[in-house]
Amino acid sequence: MLDTIESYIKSHKEKENLYVKKNVSIIGSPLAAGQPLGGVQLACDDLRKLGLHNVIDVLGWKYEDIGNIDNGDNEMKQEKKTNNYINNNDNNNDNNNDNNNDNNNNCYIPNGVIKEKKHDLSNNKMNGYVNHNFYGNYEENNVISTNDKYKNNCYYDNIRNIKEIGIFSKNLFDTMSNELRKKNFVLNIGGDHGVAFSSILSSLQMYQNLRVIWIDAHGDINIPETSPSGNYHGMTLAHTLGLFKKKVPYFEWSENLTYLKPENTAIIGIRDIDAYEKIILKKCNINYYTIFDIEKNGIYNTICTALEKIDPNSNCPIHISLDIDSVDNVFAPGTGTVAKGGLNYREINLLMKILAETKRVVSMDLVEYNPSLDEVDKKVHGDSLPILDNATKTGKLCLELIARVLGYDIV
């Protein structure tokens, strides 16, 4: 009997993560500027309060809590005096009118940069909605072309709160890069999904063969030309893939970084996709699996197929970007962008378990949990993790999913 136990312990140790030590770096990313709802910035501290540290500890992992990323308020106040961007449309109150001439390109220009006269797809926007003629312009102008970023000196000006997001993202990138160098598993807790740009790019600079599993109800793959809202959390994946055609104010720090490749990415569980996102998904060669694919083939077959597709040799490090709205709102009501028919409790837990069993997960985002929208849950007999008895439903699920990635299992 003793030999059997020792053999089990030995085999278990041999299956430890191939890339990181058994040490978690916790980073709180309380960014809410990428979407319109308040409350999502509270998630980091809420999960700490509900028992995050105890959950990690009981699973045998050490942890370092780095605290929350500075939201950049001080830097933003200082930059008001030295802001180097000017909006060329300040003197034009009708900059969304399709009848404007070519000189109105809806973009920021840094001082000293000469503005090019060229067709700009953002002129196809009218009153916040994309003109139907965009379909023709989309193909004609080859909007979706990876590794073609920043090819001109024109700047986007239709991304909401981009100054706050850009400054925050630089702070997160620097902090996460430092933690990755320690060979720790890095847990990045949002905040909205806009925080994934910095977390993925920092992981990608550390692990150049990184693969990404993006779990979400939404594609988050709009580009500024197609976004109906201008909210950055709906464009984050496109930005991370290098699909933007112009420069982004306050993201100059990222221009020379290695960007994610679509073929190294799999989106799991999408079910609420904007019209132009459908075109982008099909055109950019990314791997995606809708909720119908999961219903038809099962979550096990779906994630195994996705892993085979993006990592056929099963030897690459993995980053998980988990948007909690991928889960059906029956199980995860505490999120701002709810869509019916999401992953159920067993599916999302099994998905995390399968990814954990690869022993190659090096970093993870958990985003879009909004405690202010959550519901109190009831403790049941199977709740064995050290989570507060009065924990909310989505908060408890978030901690359970983190635990799954760290190896929490039934037996």
UniProtKB/Swiss-Prot annotation:
Binding site for Mn(2+) 2: D216, H218, D323, D325
Pathways per UniProt: Nitrogen metabolism; urea cycle; L-ornithine and urea from L-arginine: step 1/1
Required cofactor names: Mn(2+)
Catalytic activity: L-arginine + H2O = urea + L-ornithine
Entry GO MF terms: arginase activity; identical protein binding; manganese ion binding
EC number(s) given by UniProt: 3.5.3.1
Temperature-dependent activity: Stable up to 57 degrees Celsius.
Record's cofactor remark: Binds 2 manganese ions per subunit.
Regulation: Feedback inhibition by product L-ornithine,. Inhibited by 2(S)-amino-6-boronohexanoic acid (ABH); however, with less efficiency than human ARG1.
Effect noted on mutating H218A: Loss of catalytic activity. Loss of oligomerization
Result of altering H233A: Loss of catalytic activity. Loss of oligomerization
Enzyme class: hydrolase
Outcome of substituting E347Q: Severe loss of catalytic activity. Loss of oligomerization
pH-linked activity: Optimum pH is 8.5-9.
Binding residues for Mn(2+) 1: H193, D216, D220, D323
CC terms in the record's Gene Ontology section: cytoplasm; cytosol
Pfam family, one: Arginase
GO terms of biological process kind: arginine catabolic process to ornithine; urea cycle
InterPro entries documented for this protein: Ureohydrolase, Ureohydrolase_dom_sf
SUPFAM superfamilies attached to this UniProt entry: Arginase/deacetylase
Region (Disordered): 83-106
PANTHER family for the chain: ARGINASE (PTHR43782:SF3)
Family: Belongs to the arginase family.
Subunit structure: Homotrimer; oligomerization is dependent on Mn(2+) binding.
Function: Catalyzes the hydrolysis of L-arginine into urea and L-ornithine, which is a precursor for polyamine biosynthesis. May play a role in parasite intra-hepatic development during the host liver stage.
Protein name: Arginase
Lineage: Eukaryota, Sar, Alveolata, Apicomplexa, Aconoidasida
